[in-house]
C-alpha cells in the first residue's frame, strides 16, 4: 500500500510543478479600471488553464515605467505588459491616430478606429516579437485648467501636462510648456505647482482629486486613447495549446468587459465631479 501511495505521489508531482508564471507590467494604479480588468483577465486565464498559467499583475510602474514596458516585454524581462497605445507611435505610426483631436467623438467611432488599426498594429507588433491581445479605451479626454480658458492665448506661458507626442505638440502649438507627468504622479505634480492645465479624462481628474488645485473642467471629448495589452510571442508560443487558448479567450472577454467598464466610468465621473466651480 505504501508503495502505491508513493508511486501516486510521484505521478502527481510533475503536474504540481508544471505551472508557468508570467509577470505582467502596467504603469497604472491598482484601482484603475484598466488594472482591475487586467487582474480579472489574469484570474480568468489561471482558471481556464486549470492552473497551468499564472499571471502576476505588477501595477503602478512597480516593475517597469509605462514607456519602458514594450521594450521590457520584447526583451523577455516581463512576459506581458500594458501601455497606452500612443507610446508605440515611434515604431507603429498608426497608433498615433488615437491622439489626433476630434477625429473620434464617441465610443462607436473609437470601435471603428480600433477595427481599422488592429490588423496593422498586430502585424507590426508581431515583427518585434510581440503578440497583441486586446485594447480598451480611456473615457474621452477633457480639458482641466487652473484658470478659465476663453481662447488659445490663455495657454501662453503656462505649463501643460503631456503624456505622448500628440499632447506635446498640442502644448507647443498653444504656446504652453510641455511637462511630462505620468498619471500616477498627477496629484503630486499639481500639489507642487508644476502644472496649470492638462488634457485627460474626467476619470483621471476624479481618481487624482484634482479639484483641490484645478478649478475648471471642459468636457471637450478631444479623443479616446486606448491602452493595449500584449505578450512576448516566444513566451506565448512556449505555452501548451490549452493555455494558449485560455489566454486568447480571456483576452477577448477582457476587451469586451473593458470597453463596458470605460463607458460606465463616464457616467460615474460626471456624477462625481463637483458641479461647481466646474463649467
Residue ranges and their predicted role:
Residues 12-13, 33, 278:
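Alpha-helical transmembrane segments and their juxtamembrane interfaces
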Residues 14-18:
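Sec/Tat signal peptide C-region and signal peptidase I cleavage site
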Residues 270-279:
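Single conserved hydrophobic/aromatic residue that forms the stacking wall/gate
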Residues 4-13:
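Sec-dependent N-terminal signal peptides
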Residues 19-111, 117-271:
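N-terminal secretory/targeting leader peptides
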